[in-house]
Every structure is written in C-alpha cells, then in structure tokens.
Amino acid sequence: MILNTERLLLRPWNESDAESLYEYAKDPRVGPVAGWPVHTGVENSREIIRTVLSAPETYAVCLKGDDRPVGCVGLSTGERSNLVLPEDEGEIGYWIGVPFWGQGLIPEAVREVIRRAFAELDLTTLWCGYFDGNEQSRRVQEKCGFRYHHTCRDIHWRAMDDIRTEHITRLTREEWEAGTASERKDA
C-alpha cells in the first residue's frame, strides 16, 4: 500500500532503506524520546526494518520526488498495538529525522494514516501516546485532532529498559468526521 499527501509519499519499508534509516536513527534526539534505542549501525537498521518496520501499515515517510525515507508512521491494530485494544481500534506511532523537524511533515503523514484508518479500514477509535517531556509529539497529536484521555505512570518501557510516564490521547471516528466536515465547510 502506498499513500500520497501533498508533499509526501508513504510506502512500505525495504531493506535497501537501511542506510537512510541509520542516518536519522543514529541521532540520540530521535529514538529515545519515541521509546526506542539509538541505532548502532546500518546492519542494526536493516534488522529493525526486517523485524519491526516490515509490519503491516508501517510506512516509510518520503518526500515526494525523493524515495529516501526521512521518517516513519505506523498504525498497529488490536493485539499488535502497545496498548490492549480491540481489533476495530488502532494506535498510531511516528518519528522523523531531525533535519525535517518543524516543517509539519509528520502531522501531514499522520493525517493520511488517520484517513486510511477510518475511511478504508473502518476503525472506530485511534490512540496515540507521548512520553513526559516530548512536547513535539504532544503537539503533533493535538494538530491531528487527538485529545488527552489518560496517563500511565511509572511504566517499565522494555525497549529502553527504563521507567516512564506516558500520556495517552484518543480520536474517535465521529470526532474525525466532524473535523473533516468543518474543514470542508471552511474551504
């Protein structure tokens, strides 16, 4: 599945993307705030593509006209989610390389995955989370219509082997439909 937005192409990851992934995933400002360790080399990135990023509905975020990934957005439904969710609900996760911060690219990618989740996959509810201190992620979620739902304190985050506080946000299909209707009316 390939998704298009105004500026982005969202496509499945390929093992040949390992060098581009490593370029951004080696930066300690990217992975740890999102809940995963800094990549240690191109082979580590290749293994992550094989074992994590090859999951269904996980997309390499590429600028149109350039097939190299600069970030990632993914949708995990039901049991594949980090949360305990029914099959008609999903969780969205994302990250983008530091050179692309502040350009509105991840909100654009997330909005397209939201559209697919509700309009094509017929999900009823989407969830997102951000760790304490990750204000950029909180703002992405707000821009995309997610609203605060609850906080999980003192959770052991296995990928980083540390204790974290995660804030969970939610967007229902009805909220999304109301928001897209008002956007069409304003246009």
Show the residue positions of the predicted features.
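Short C-terminal domain-edge/linker segments immediately following a structured domain
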Residues: 39-44, 53-55, 105-106, 157-161
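Acyl-donor (CoA/ACP) binding surface of acyl/acetyltransferases
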Residues: 1-33, 62-187
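Conserved GNAT-fold acetyl-CoA-binding loop/helix
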Residues: 29-50
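A short helix-loop-beta-strand connector motif used in the catalytic cores of GNAT acetyltransferases and
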Residues: 49-60
